[in-house]
Amino acid sequence: FFLQHPDVFNKVIALSGVYDARFFVGDFGGDEAIYQNSPSDYIWNQNDGWFIDRYRQAEIVVCTGLGAWEQDGLPSFYKLKEAFDHKNIPAWFAEWGHDVAHDWEWWRKQMPYFLGQMYL
């Protein structure tokens, strides 16, 4: 939602996500609704200065673990990071350890940690 509406939010924390819609639907062709919800594609093609400026002013955290059940999301995590770097959008892409699983136990630790880093 943040990438579509950076005028509404100026902070975002994304935990353990899959950021490429192909993981869920395969090749989505020209389906605009799916494209709009595939962040790793959407950000690569976003060239509107209004959006880019707001992304650059926002606080963005994207975090993944490297443990159980996180492997499916890692390719899109790195693809999204590459897109942000290419667009010079500052964001904190955090990789937690190999013991960090795709699970509530870890999200309950990560969310307060990152909120504290954002001074919220």
Report the location of each language-model feature.
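Non-catalytic cap/lid and distal C-terminal segments of serine-dependent acyl enzymes
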Residues: 1-120
